[in-house]
Amino acid sequence: NVIIRKPATPGMEDRKGVVLQGHLDMVPQKNSDKKHDFEADPIEAFVDGEWVTANGTTLGADNGIGVSSALAVLTTDKIKHGPVEVLLTATEETGMDGANGLKPGVMKGDILINTDSEDEGELYVGCAGGEDANILFNYTNEETPYGVVALKLDITGMKGGHSGIDIPLQRGNAIKVFFRILNAAYEEHGVRLARIDGGSLRNAIPREAFGVVVVDEAKTADFVAQAYEIAQNVKSELAETEPDLKVLVEETELPFSLIDEETQRKMTKAVIACPNGVIRMSDTMPGLVETSTNLALLKSDEQNKTIKAGCLMRSSVDSAKEDLAQRIKAVFELAGAKVEFSGNYPGWKPNMDSPILKTMQDVYNRPFGK
């Protein structure tokens, strides 16, 4: 964590202290064809019309906008103010360890303004709590039979995004698309799974999923046609949100072994049944998501013979979050997986009568008239 303090303007020492809070980390997500080391390479930012964006990676505006805003307040001499503190926490995107590690009493301010938002003209007055579901399948190897063809099944071109901010946009999930194809292909053509690598980060909507499957030589053409037909159906269903969805099926090297059929079947059904996306909208604030979940990761490990999946559940109502967690646990435990929870943190309940909210609304209204 980083804490920066700025003394009050002379004569304003008796005013209430203000804490400007943000976080230093970002969601480091990139396209599979982009060569980028987030620990060493700078973000390739460029201007596209009225927007600053990045080339093949996330930009880091979450929470770069908030951090830069707080630093601007610190560096200007044009604002009269009481004591100001800037609190920039670490690992907000991966469990809030920085915030959780903050000792009581370290911050001296009376008012805290959270700068972790990026929508002009909007004030954030609450936030969902979250919890991770860590899912583990153990599997055995089955020898690859004779008379089959190995095919890569790649889902790319989806928008992805932050699983909290972008979840109301109803974007597709590449893992869900992959298993939608696999489920139909197994039922109709007996297609078997050798390996799967879906998603990249626990708090990002999966934009890509890659796998290797095998199919009887005689059924190859039918499977390929089926995969592209399902892909076209998904593109039609998500025409407004996923216009660039791509499905690639092409021959590859035959694997030595497959994930055992029973595990494949049960896991596939669990992924199909797993809740995903917006679960419930708020009854009190129109347009606000109350409860949501995102199937973020699903990856096989051939060396350890395991398949790990991860869901991040969010809700501003703790009891609803716990209910959703138990639903997801039930789905995967019925399929034979082990499910554990981690990283639970509470929500920030909105207070529509907050005097700070009224002040912020008045300050915004003066120059903009709205």
Model-identified regions with their sequence ranges:
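A non-catalytic alpha/beta surface segment that caps or lines the substrate-entry region
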Residues: 1-16
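Active-site metal-coordination/substrate-binding segment of hydrolases
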Residues: 12-94, 99-110, 132, 147-150, ...
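Short, conserved charged micro-motifs
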Residues: 13-14, 217-226, 318-324
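Fold-level recognition of mixed alpha/beta catalytic cores in primary-metabolism enzymes, strongest
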Residues: 84-174, 182, 186
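Acidic-enriched catalytic cores of C-N bond-cleaving enzymes acting on peptides and small amides
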Residues: 126, 143-148, 167-197, 217-292, ...
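An extended, acidic, His-containing surface patch that forms the Zn2+-binding/catalytic region
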Residues: 250-294, 302, 318, 322-323, ...
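C-terminal catalytic subdomain
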Residues: 300, 306-325
